[in-house]
Each structure stands twice: as C-alpha cells, then as structure tokens.
C-alpha cells in the first residue's frame, strides 16, 4: 500500500487495480486519516483518472448494503456537488417534480460535504433520510419515489465524512457518489462539477451497462442550466453521443445564474418548498423544469419542450408539494407504528 501512496504523492496516476486496493484499505480501516486525506488531495490536484474512478466504484459497489431492487424501470437524478455555486438544490427538487410527471425515482444522495447544502440536508428536515431499505422500497412502490442516504448503505462514507468536511474540496468520493446508487438504476441523470468529467463518467456508465444515461455540466454547475449552454454526454443502447442544449431547446427563457443563489440552508429549504408549492421564482421553476425535461427523456419522452411544460404545469398546481407531504406522513406513521410495538 505504501507503494501506491508514494505513486500518488509523486503526482502520478494509479491503475484500476491499485485504485481498488486503495479503496479496499480505506474500507478495512487500514489507512490513517492523514493518509486518506493525502491520497485524495494528490488525485484532486492533477485530476482523477478514468481508472482511478472505476476502481473505486467497483470496490464500493461490492460493499453496498443490499437494497430490494424493483423490476420496473426507474432512474436516479444526482450530481457530484463540489461546484461551489451555492445554488438552490436542483436535483432533489427535480426528483420530486419528476415523480409527479410519472417518472419512477430512487434518488441516492448525501449530506453536504463541500457545498452549502446536500440533498439529504433538505430531506432530513422532512424525516426522509433514515428509512430502512424496506421502508424506502415501500415508499417507492406506493408513491413512485424514495431516497437512499449514502452512509446508510456504505459505512465507509460515514467514517470518512469528517475528513472530507475538513478538506472542504471535491474529491474522488464526490465523483464516485453518483455512480454507486445501491439500487443499481438502469437510468440516471448525473451532473458533474467540471466539464472534463463528462467523458470518464459516461464511459463508466457504459461499462456498468446502464440502459440510458445522461451526464451534464453547465457553466460551472453540476446541473442542466439556463444561464449558459449545457454540455451533454448521453449513453443509449451502448452508444455515446455528445451535444449541447440551450434554454431555447426546452422552450424556456434564459436567466443569469445569480438568480439561483442561496446563502443558507434555511433559505435553500424555503426556495425548495416554494417551488414545490408553485410559489417559486420563475427562474427557479424554469431550471427545475429543464432538469425534469431531460430526466423524462430517459424514459422515452423525447420532446424536451413538452416535458418542460408538463413539469411547469405540475409545479403550478403545487402537486409536487403534496407528494413531499405524503412522503413525510408515511415516515411519521411508520415511526409511530414502530414505537408502539
């Protein structure tokens, strides 16, 4: 293991097998916090490679807590985080809206590490991140959506969280997070914090045999955006295509990114709730509609403009907030039942 660490410290790449060995040592608690931090920083400085990423993904997937995988078609929508944009939480809000549009969603996420707020920071306030795998699956069967809190399925992620929080930078674990959903979805929409990650991530999704996957980056954020062209890498039937989308492709207006900024977790939550209730700012609702539109493409709905309008219609009537309330009520009811046993 020291040889692998020395290679990293010298600014050199490690191969897939070495990456697997490194992750295995981290999982088995054979490395100190300083060694882990040093390895992560070494990769971050020169840029994580395809082999380093796939090696980490392979090992982590073999150590996931089992999840009762549905037989039906379902998707994840997630991002690497780490873009330091401090925008509203787009992927979580989009997941809820997409579910009201008929998409089946199993969203995998984490607490904030290097960003202002993570998907699970928002959902924690609605008691939605501590579901057992069985309860999460029940929510999926009944409501068409559920949320999987990454550290519940990967104990190593819980152990290294303090290290990542102290580093306050995106690392290898930001990159692999969207690739290790324990439900192993056949469809996924992934945002990456830098354009250079589009190619390695879509190639890894190809190796993992996803049916249909889209990876996006837009002007510094790991989402579909309306402030700048969105760069796309799409995998469908084992074929990869690259292209660019703009706001007009969704039938939406452009907005400056500054309108999406938020400056506290409280504000992030308020923005999300307002969007779901149909009371959000037009720019907020529009960017959610764009992300939902592309997500629906994974399910075969190829008209992005029609998809965006469907999302805006659901938002206008507050239907996504009703779904969020149903998820919260389900959690509370199950908690009460558990306590009376």
Swiss-Prot record:
GO biological process per UniProt: L-tryptophan biosynthetic process
SUPFAM superfamilies named among the record's database cross-references: Nucleoside phosphorylase/phosphoribosyltransferase catalytic domain (SSF52418), Nucleoside phosphorylase/phosphoribosyltransferase N-terminal domain (SSF47648)
Cofactor requirement: Mg(2+)
Summary of the function given for this chain in its UniProt record: Catalyzes the transfer of the phosphoribosyl group of 5-phosphorylribose-1-pyrophosphate (PRPP) to anthranilate to yield N-(5'-phosphoribosyl)-anthranilate (PRA).
Pathway entry: Amino-acid biosynthesis; L-tryptophan biosynthesis; L-tryptophan from chorismate: step 2/5
Family: Belongs to the anthranilate phosphoribosyltransferase family.
Catalytic activity, EC: 2.4.2.18
Stated name of the protein: Anthranilate phosphoribosyltransferase
Native organism: Blochmanniella pennsylvanica (strain BPEN)
Keyword Glycosyltransferase: yes
Binding sites annotated in the UniProt record for Mg(2+) 2: 222-223
UniProt-annotated binding residues for anthranilate 2: 164
Reactions catalysed, as given in the entry: N-(5-phospho-beta-D-ribosyl)anthranilate + diphosphate = 5-phospho-alpha-D-ribose 1-diphosphate + anthranilate
Keywords: Amino-acid biosynthesis, Aromatic amino acid biosynthesis, Glycosyltransferase, Magnesium, Metal-binding, Transferase, Tryptophan biosynthesis
InterPro entries on file: Anthranilate_Pribosyl_Tfrase, Glycosyl_Trfase_fam3, Glycosyl_Trfase_fam3_N_dom, Glycosyl_Trfase_fam3_N_dom_sf, Nuc_phospho_transferase
Binding site for 5-phospho-alpha-D-ribose 1-diphosphate: 79, 82-83, 87, 89-92, 107-115, 119
Record: residues binding Mg(2+) 1: 91, 223
Assembly behavior: Homodimer.
GO CC, any one term: cytosol
Cofactor-binding details, from the entry: Binds 2 magnesium ions per monomer.
Domain of life, source organism: Bacteria
């Amino acid at each position: 293991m020291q040889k692998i660490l020395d290679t990293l410290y010298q600014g050199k790449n490690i191969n897939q097998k070495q990456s697997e060995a490194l992750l295995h040592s981290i999982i088995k608690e054979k490395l100190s916090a300083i060694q882990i931090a040093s390895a992560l920083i070494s990769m971050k400085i020169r840029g994580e490679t395809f082999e380093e990423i796939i090696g980490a993904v392979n090992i982590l997937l073999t150590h996931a807590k089992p999840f009762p995988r549905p037989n039906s078609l379902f998707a994840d929508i997630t991002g690497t985080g780490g873009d330091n944009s401090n925008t509203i939480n787009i992927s979580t809000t989009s997941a809820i809206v997409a579910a009201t549009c008929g998409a089946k969603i199993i969203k995998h996420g984490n607490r904030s590490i290097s960003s202002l707020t993570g998907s699970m920071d928002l959902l924690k306030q609605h008691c939605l991140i501590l579901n057992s795998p069985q309860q999460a699956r029940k929510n999926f069967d009944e409501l068409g959506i559920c949320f999987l809190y990454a550290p519940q399925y990967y104990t190593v992620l819980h152990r290294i969280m303090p290290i990542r929080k102290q580093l306050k930078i995106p690392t290898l674990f930001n990159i692999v997070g969207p690739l290790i959903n324990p439900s192993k979805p056949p469809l996924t929409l992934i945002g990456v914090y830098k354009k250079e990650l589009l190619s390695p991530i879509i190639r890894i999704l190809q190796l993992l045999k996803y049916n249909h996957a889209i990876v996006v980056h837009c002007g510094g954020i790991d989402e579909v955006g309306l402030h700048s062209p969105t760069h796309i890498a799409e995998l469908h039937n084992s074929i990869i295509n690259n292209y660019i989308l703009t706001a007009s492709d969704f039938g939406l207006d452009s907005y400056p990114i500054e309108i999406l900024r938020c400056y506290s977790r409280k504000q992030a939550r308020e923005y999300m709730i307002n969007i779901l209730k149909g009371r959000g700012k037009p720019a907020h609702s529009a960017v959610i509609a764009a992300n939902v539109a592309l997500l629906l493409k994974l399910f075969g709905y190829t008209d992005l403009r029609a998809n965006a309008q469907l999302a805006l219609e659901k938002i206008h009537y507050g239907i996504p907030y009703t779904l969020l309330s149903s998820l919260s009520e389900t959690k509370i009811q199950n908690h009460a039942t558990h306590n009376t046993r």
